[in-house]
């Protein structure tokens, strides 16, 4: 096909743009919400430390910068909120990003937060090895939680995290003197009383129990896998099955470590 000469530069520009198309990342969450509402998409927010966080840099290089990841834009409006150490940012951007990290309870980088078009979170993840195709499948699986029930469950999980953090600090102060004396029995009694008195239930109870009890065993009986397994079995037996899935996986890891130690002897 012969094209008029004045169209050739235009065609060349279009071809170049297609060949080197870049994925668009917004840097303003309010703008992203407006776009998401209009296009009926969810929002993916990357909380990153672009010039210092090793895992953030790997995630960008291995996943976000790969052409296959452009498929994510079919379902998500992409947002990057950066928390650099050397890169210059305006005071306004720093303040806005800080407020968002506090609002969503971001504690580490990279954190990938998935929101509905109104900005309500329903899932959270981070670095995952395997490249863009595997990561897209991971996002598709997480997107199943973009329901009223999923968002409520996510909100409860965040609430539990805050509860566990606060109670964990209190409990640590309470049992540290006992652990310094290697008095595991007294520490166990104090932990049980604390959880009962605070009326901690559900996933928060499981997490608090594991952190405090396993930590106590490790402090008093370092390297004793049998003692750790005993504690884990008690916690698993004392809580509903739907709350102990990850705990059972952890138990399997401890059992494997125990078996490996026996093989070395």
Regions found by a protein language model. Name each.
Residues 1-8:
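Bacterial N-terminal signal peptides that target proteins for export
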Residues 8-16:
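Bacterial N-terminal signal peptides
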Residues 15-23:
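Bacterial Sec-dependent signal peptides at the C-terminal "C-region" and cleavage site
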Residues 21, 139-265:
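Non-globular targeting/processing and membrane-anchoring segments
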Residues 23-27, 48-49, 62-95, 106-109:
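Thiol-based oxidoreductase modules, predominantly thioredoxin-like and allied folds used
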Residues 27, 31, 55-58, 68, ...:
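Extracytoplasmic/secreted proteins, especially bacterial periplasmic and envelope-associated proteins
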Residues 27-69:
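Local sequence-structure signature of Cys/Sec-based thiol-disulfide redox active-site neighborhoods
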Residues 62-64, 99-147:
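Non-catalytic, surface beta->alpha helical segment in thiol-disulfide oxidoreductase systems
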